[in-house]
Amino acid sequence: MIVVTGAAGFIGSNLVRGLNRRGIQDIIAVDDLTEGDKFLNLVDCQIADYLDKDEFRRRVLAGSLPPLRAVLHQGACSDTTERNGRYMLDNNYRVTLELFEYCQAHAIPFLYASSAAVYGGSSVYVEDPTNERPLNVYGYSKLLFDQVLRTRMKSLTAQVVGLRYFNVYGPHEQHKGRMASVAFHNMNQFLAEGHVRLFAGWDGYADGGQSRDFISVEDVVAVNLHFLDNPGTSGIFNCGTGRAQPFNDVAAAVVNTLREERGEAALPLDKLVEQGLVRYIPFPDDLKGRYQSYTQADVTQLRAAGFAAPMRDVQTGVAEYVRYWRARKA
């Protein structure tokens, strides 16, 4: 049996599908369906059982779970604007620590979601404490458990892998609202208004030039399954493509894929801007000083751990996402 927490969420539900594609259905899905629409992410998934996150936590603390092959811990509050530190640390740090201790006590492999938010204001994205400067309590809540793992690395009884997700996009993120990817928002904007919006330049960046390491959720699933297949490997690893691309690339990929659907030719960025299909809005004052304008994962350690598969660039991955999303809407 494999536990997937956050199973009705974005990455969690895609992980369940990835396991299903391997013929694995002995899955305990753990989530909080207070926002009931998230169940839609599990409709086409095969699982053995569902547990509410609070009931699951009680069973963890009571030591009453069935024998497990692995725990894939994706459940967390991922809202980077959440200011309630007490809630964030309990939900993201304390629960992760409890699961870690349970898995160590029972020699169960434990893969968990960390985040590139731990780097915050750093300009170097290498898995080293000198580069970790979170800008918000979300990033700190993720860093705190990474620090615990580092102190325990030499005494582990079973595999523990922390994956620092960079900017993930792809199917089944619709419930995330404002925290959904820019690709998701650009798709909705273009279909509703005929154009997309990006932040104008700030902090030395041109309009739409702020750059992130955008990674398809399909590649995130592949990384998780790689470590599931290699239980002898533990550590903290960046989960990105190793390639920074500007938000302009995302917008252009969205608009051109939707244009092609209509039988219209793809256009270069300057023409998209000239025709008003890509527009820029002033950079929000409340984000100044709290915004990562550039991220690019150093994937040296990930590659050294044996993950050799190529990863999608924005042009490929976003186009796949748009086509998938439009097919589901048809």
From Swiss-Prot:
GO terms for molecular function: ADP-glyceromanno-heptose 6-epimerase activity; NADP binding. Pathway: Nucleotide-sugar biosynthesis; ADP-L-glycero-beta-D-manno-heptose biosynthesis; ADP-L-glycero-beta-D-manno-heptose from D-glycero-beta-D-manno-heptose 7-phosphate: step 4/4. Its cofactor is NADP(+). It is an enzyme of class 5 (isomerase). InterPro entries: Epimerase_deHydtase, Heptose_epim, NAD(P)-bd_dom_sf. Transmembrane segments: none annotated. The active site is at Y138, K176. Keywords: Carbohydrate metabolism, Isomerase, NADP. Catalyzes the interconversion between ADP-D-glycero-beta-D-manno-heptose and ADP-L-glycero-beta-D-manno-heptose via an epimerization at carbon 6 of the heptose. This is ADP-L-glycero-D-manno-heptose-6-epimerase.
